[in-house]
């Protein structure tokens, strides 16, 4: 059995991810499958960590790139349904993680309210002095701990290179608290 599982809606992406895991020696504990999460009824309450990077918009400006258009727009279900599905997949005391647009935060928190606690919000700023375009939300099942807003993670320096903190997370595997 895998230590980590991931699902992709597109078969080609699942295959590519499995090939990458194998090429890097991770095939014994990483597994990627092709399925529609809303039709995937197995494994309820079985994951310690559920990480989600859902489509960002119901009607985002469509990209000319079909892969990006699919990734950015949810057509089958809205964000609330997506989050409720993720919550079902988390085992007791498990964690939920999501990255999404900052303007979706109110909707995300509304779905989490009363279901998950220990909610932590990390605003993501493209550059210092700008407002958050994305947020990372972490929450825990069966927790009543209060909401925490962390310091923002600034992704790029003025010259466009990664900030020290972002580089550590993206390239060195540092953990966001």
Regions found by a protein language model. Name each.
Residues 131-177:
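SAM/dcSAM-binding transferase cores
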Residues 25-37:
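Conserved SAM-binding strand-loop segment of SAM-dependent methyltransferases
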Residues 45, 54-81:
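Mobile active-site "lid"/loop adjacent to the S-adenosyl-L-methionine
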Residues 17-21:
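Conserved SAM-binding loop
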Residues 1-8:
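Short, small-residue-biased leader/transition segments that mark boundaries at the very start
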Residues 39-50:
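A short acidic, Gly/Pro-enriched loop at the edge of an enzyme's catalytic core
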Residues 76-132, 136-137:
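Conserved Class I SAM-dependent methyltransferase catalytic core
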Residues 10-12:
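Conserved SAM/SAH-binding beta-strand->alpha-helix loop
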